[in-house]
Amino acid sequence: MQILPLLAPAEARFELPASKSAANRLLIAAALSGARVEFEPAGLNADIEAVQRGLAAFGFRVEGGTGGIRVGPGPRAATAGARIDCGEAGTALRFLAALAALLPGEWELHGSARLLQRPFEPLADALRALGAEVRVVPGEGSAPSDRISSLWVRGRSPQAPAPRRVALEAQLSSQFLSALLLIGAELGPAGLEIELRGPLASGDYARLTARILERFGVEARAEGPLWSVRRRFRPAPEPMRIALPPDWGAFGVWACLQHASGSRIEAPGLDPQDG
């Protein structure tokens, strides 16, 4: 293959795939809200598809693909458990594990060997404190990549009182905090307070989660190391239509080309708050 350099600055405009960071949070918030939510067509990826599979396995109404995704309306169908393939998606594994902790039943989440080696224990400790059972299912091999087969979660009983506050170590990943924020408002009228122990990694992603929750009527706040969510999800009276924001990460190489060549490259829909 021959690659020829640009001889002069160029102009281009194109659509980027959907941001998996925003899409995964929006899908879970939409499912918990019970509202009818339609997501406008956008390029999907394996991470978003893994969250869709997980929501369907939990009994939520979710359908569609590249032509648009529809979630809800109504409560989830009763189901006592499922085995969910998260593929390579660390966000899906962590968010779906938190959602599994909220739902009665026994859930097994699995994926690639590399996925199951990623940090998870700080989130598992917090989910146990909320009343869920979480354990690692050992694999049959002796190699590091074969020592974990899957994660097993038994959801907490809806009748069991939930603690008002949990502690969390989030210096390894802000996804631990985002996962708890997504489910916290559904634990009861008082919601949930999350006390961070140590620094927070990539706090912008936690703030993205808070903004998304507020779109669905959940109050999310941060005061120093204490994060809180209150007010349960409220179904919108009318169907919601949401455009999935494009992925800043996918624009990175084009931004470099634009800077190096003096070209003008546009990708509509990029939100500076998501970058």
Residue ranges of model-derived segments:
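Short, structured segments at the rim of ligand-binding sites
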Residues: 1-275
